[in-house]
């Protein structure tokens, strides 16, 4: 179970389904489902109660006669709706011997109902351009869809159907259990997960169910795997209207939306709620210590103190304390541990839980610092809280950060709905009404009292990760991969083909409203300042926030020879001190008002980002301008950054990679196989990167900055609650004095890479303690963003593996055969030729079979092509889901910046759907022949040896 990085996220939720962006249509469900014991129409029985609370949030609370609670909030900034159902059941409701049951049940909720065959739920959402997912937490299980607002009824029908009528077919259960095992193994690949979930929490909780992992103990999962009745009985005990909350936020009329929910959910009778006694955790009366030892490179320290549950009087003080300790570079732990070289990273805080949980400190030691020394540093900071009151400035900054977070979350319908649902599902539906008032009432004396009450040695659990050396041994041979593609036949799914065809014919929906956003979109404005800096502004006055994104043509492609990483270090140093402000002053200036600025490296450019409330937009601009125009490159900060970079490289040695994170072992080997040294997309090995990082000097960074940071290669995009003319004036005031050099910019050229004359040999990276194997297959795809067939190629890639559940790879490898939890394929088009790649995360014993199916599916697609139906469904998804990315100011800004970067035009967002819809089947088939080459790719195997 992944621990949230901040307590504002839903409590300890597990991202269970490989973040499926799934499409859907409405049909196959009957107009009304008959429950075994149906209630009379809620509209007729007079027991529907509805009222509006939290005037600032405009939330309407409705109670149906069957006990279902509905929370609805209108938000009309984008034509989308976030629809979710929160069940008040999670791993805390399980019993010993059946742990993991909630998570298995969540997986099976996607495997069909009495009316919907396996695969139909995903199919329906995908073909309607929606995103669907679910998470299992300790206290709740959460199902949610982000979809065009005119598809709200689809979400309600499907969620109501599977609340009552999920089927739990034994064959589907057998397939899905392999996927669950793969997910469990993938989690345990991470030493951090293993330390927190399998070591630290079980030590901290001896009696309460927070003792066990949300995904379950492996032995329990195996015991439940074959027992359909146990899973079904658990479903019937917990999935019922009177144990659920529906939350919907988006572009709808409240009365109509509630009527839709009443129509589909109101027909079900309330269930008999299980009287399940949760054993409370007794007071801890002595320090507990545990140690995890496994192969790895970097240690880790966790310290947890028992604290009260969410909503308890001291909970609000603990939230403030979390900000003081961990929120930003000005926070106490960063200043005391990271700035002083004890820690590579350090943070901590409390989490939202129904029952008393922990205030957790989490730190990673710097090189040559022991876990014990780092623990002493953490303890010193806790003692400081107990002996000295926090300053008025710290207290005010923490409160401003919390207030800003409340404002920022209203940028997104998803975040608004998640916060509402999280608290309603733990029976605190009005939590947000009074939260800010209670936070504002916290005093320095409260902080000191709470620290003295809870942060005591007898109340804490300490966990160390002590990495062990990797055992010596030669890499095993790669798994055999058959090459008999000629015998391949078209793939069909006998369980689904006829039913899904009938479903599509029955529904035959009009194009989702999100697929044609041109009519309602505001028009951005583009201005070029006299110094060449490009400014794009789009107004959105729905929420008093502003998002900024941008870039400077100063990426890693310009790194000097033998000093890879200069560009990244230069970008990172810009926020670590200017000629007018220290790193701490820069951080505190922004953090004191809950704003933020980021500058990071990239392959082709340095990337800029920022966010603030409207009232602080001027501060955001002036800080970014100071960092871009007047960096000081202080020597002490550079050495600190060098040490952190080296520690990060050591961390990468224990990461199998393959999931999209740059710098991990599989991605490094993959990039080295595809691109020659010196190419912008080539990546050094960890050893090479360490040597380069040690060799880079301050003079290298200053020289790079003076050469490549210039206004005429800079783009700034601003979206939010600003007036275009005012924003342009403010940007010109902040950046207009940045002089353009007389010399022209450095050439921006990404060279072509010739196709390999022979297929590279597979590469094996052995991490013996990893329970899962990551497989990365691919080649230089030959596609650029400017390629005329870019859109046809993306349709081809989507059909192959663009979705975990709706693609050919996903359906065959995960859904039908249960061989992998994570399955994906992509064809990247950049300024240069990007990679084609397929990623699989699988158990070592399934690796050879999964690879064989992958090759077979590729060969079948190349030999037989794709169907017109597949092309239509791909278009529906690719056009329908795109505007879902535009629900936030940051999302819109990112798309406008990309359109500028690739010279797509200011109207690209409005035109994008037409560009996809214009692609013909013949163009897709041609793209398959051009870009799909199953026999040419390199194979990277990382993790446990494939069997």
Q: Over which residues does each language-model region extend?
A:
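Histidine-acidic residue clusters that define the catalytic metal-binding segment
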Residues: 43-61, 201-244, 276-281, 309, ...
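M16 family metallopeptidases and their MPP-like homologs
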Residues: 73, 77-96, 100-104, 118-163, ...
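Non-catalytic, conformational "gating/processing" segments within enzyme and secreted inhibitor domains
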Residues: 177, 230-263, 459, 651, ...
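Short, conserved secondary-structure transition motifs
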Residues: 181-187, 280-294, 398-409, 612-613, ...
């Amino acid at each position: 179970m992944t621990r949230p990085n901040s307590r504002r996220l839903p409590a300890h939720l597990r991202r269970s389904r490989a973040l499926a962006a799934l499409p859907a249509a409405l049909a196959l469900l009957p107009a009304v489902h008959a429950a075994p014991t149906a209630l009379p129409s809620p509209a007729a029985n007079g027991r529907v109660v509805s009222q509006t609370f939290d005037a600032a949030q405009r939330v309407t609370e409705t109670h149906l006669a069957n006990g279902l609670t509905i929370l609805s909030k209108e938000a009309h900034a984008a034509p989308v709706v976030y629809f979710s159902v929160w069940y008040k059941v999670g791993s805390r409701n399980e019993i010993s011997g059946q742990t993991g049951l909630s998570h298995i049940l969540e997986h099976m909720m996607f495997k069909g109902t009495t009316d919907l065959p396996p695969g139909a739920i995903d199919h329906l959402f995908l073909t309607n351009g929606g995103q669907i997912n679910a998470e299992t937490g300790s206290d709740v299980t959460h199902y949610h869809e982000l979809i065009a607002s005119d598809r709200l009824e689809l979400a309600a029908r499907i969620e109501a159907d599977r609340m009552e009528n999920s089927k739990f077919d034994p064959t589907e259960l057998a397939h899905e259990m392999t996927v669950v095992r793969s997910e469990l193994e993938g989690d345990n690949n991470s030493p951090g997960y293993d330390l927190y979930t399998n070591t630290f929490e079980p030590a901290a909780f001896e009696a309460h169910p927070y003792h066990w992992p949300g995904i379950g103990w492996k032995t329990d999962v195996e015991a439940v795997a074959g027992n359909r009745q146990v899973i079904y009985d658990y479903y019937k005990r917990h999935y019922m209207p009177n144990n659920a909350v529906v939350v919907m936020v988006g572009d709808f009329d409240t009365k109509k939306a509630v009527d839709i929910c009443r129509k589909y959910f109101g027909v079900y009778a309330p269930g008999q709620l299980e009287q399940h006694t949760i054993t409370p955790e007794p007071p801890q009366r002595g320090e507990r210590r545990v140690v995890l030892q496994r192969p790895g490179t970097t240690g880790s320290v966790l310290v947890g103190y028992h604290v009260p549950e969410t909503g308890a009087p001291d909970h609000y003080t603990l939230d403030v304390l979390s900000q003081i300790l961990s929120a930003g570079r000005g926070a106490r732990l960063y200043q005391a541990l990271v700035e002083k070289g004890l820690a590579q990273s350090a943070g901590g805080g409390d989490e939202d839980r129904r029952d008393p949980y922990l205030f957790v400190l989490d730190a990673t030691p710097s090189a040559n610092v022991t876990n014990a020394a780092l623990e002493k540093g953490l303890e010193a900071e806790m003692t400081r809280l107990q002996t000295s009151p926090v300053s008025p400035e710290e207290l005010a900054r923490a409160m401003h950060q919390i207030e800003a977070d409340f404002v920022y979350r209203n940028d997104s319908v998803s975040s608004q709905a998640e916060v509402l649902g999280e608290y309603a599902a733990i029976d605190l539906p009005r939590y947000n009404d009074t939260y800010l008032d209670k936070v504002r009432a916290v005093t320095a004396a409260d902080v000191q009292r709470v620290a003295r009450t809870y942060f005591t040695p007898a109340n804490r659990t300490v966990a160390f990760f002590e990495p062990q050396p990797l055992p010596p041994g030669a890499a095993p041979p790669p798994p055999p991969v058959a090459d008999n593609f000629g015998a391949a036949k078209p793939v069909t799914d006998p369980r689904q083909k006829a039913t899904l065809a009938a479903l599509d014919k029955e529904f035959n929906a009009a194009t989702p409203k999100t697929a044609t956003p041109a009519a309602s979109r505001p028009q951005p404005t583009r201005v070029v300042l006299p110094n060449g800096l490009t400014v794009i502004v789009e107004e959105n006055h729905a929420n008093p926030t502003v998002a900024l994104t941008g870039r400077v043509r100063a990426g890693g492609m310009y790194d000097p020879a033998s000093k890879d990483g200069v560009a990244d270090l230069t970008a990172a140093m810009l926020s670590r001190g200017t000629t007018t402000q220290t790193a701490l002053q820069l951080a505190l200036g922004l953090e004191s008002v809950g704003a933020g600025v980021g500058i990071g490296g990239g392959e082709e450019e340095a990337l800029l980002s920022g966010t603030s409330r409207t009232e602080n937009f001027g501060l955001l601009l002036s800080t970014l301008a100071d960092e871009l125009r007047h960096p000081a490159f202080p020597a002490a900060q550079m050495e600190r950054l060098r040490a952190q970079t080296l520690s990060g490289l050591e961390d990468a040695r224990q990461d199998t990679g393959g999931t999209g994170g740059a710098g991990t072992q599989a991605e490094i080997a993959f990039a080295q196989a595809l691109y020659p040294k010196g190419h912008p997309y080539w990546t050094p090995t960890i050893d090479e990167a360490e040597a380069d990082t040690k060799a880079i000097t301050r003079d290298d960074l200053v020289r790079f900055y003076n050469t490549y940071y210039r206004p005429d290669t800079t783009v700034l995009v601003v979206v939010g609650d600003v007036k275009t003319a005012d924003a342009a004036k403010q940007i010109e005031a902040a950046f207009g004095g940045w002089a353009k050099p007389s010399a022209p910019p450095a050439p921006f050229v990404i060279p072509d890479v010739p196709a390999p004359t022979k297929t590279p040999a597979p590469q094996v990276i052995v991490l013996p303690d990893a329970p899962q194997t990551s497989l990365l297959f691919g080649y230089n795809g030959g596609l650029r963003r400017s390629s005329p067939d870019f859109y046809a190629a993306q349709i081809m890639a989507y059909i192959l593996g663009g979705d975990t559940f709706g693609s050919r790879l996903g359906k065959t490898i995960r859904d039908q055969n249960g061989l992998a939890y994570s399955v994906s394929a992509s064809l990247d088009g950049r300024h240069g030729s990007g990679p084609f790649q397929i990623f699989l995360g699988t158990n070592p014993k399934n690796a050879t079979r999964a690879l064989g199916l992958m090759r077979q599916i590729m060969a079948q697609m190349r030999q037989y092509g794709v169907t017109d139906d597949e092309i239509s469904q791909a278009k529906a998804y690719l056009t329908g889901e795109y505007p879902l990315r535009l629900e936030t100011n940051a999302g819109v800004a990112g798309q406008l910046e990309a359109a500028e970067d690739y010279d797509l035009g200011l109207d690209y967002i409005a035109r994008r759907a037409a560009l996809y819809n214009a692609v013909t089947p013949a163009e897709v088939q041609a793209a398959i022949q051009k870009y799909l080459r199953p026999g040419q790719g390199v194979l990277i195997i990382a993790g446990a040896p494939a069997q």
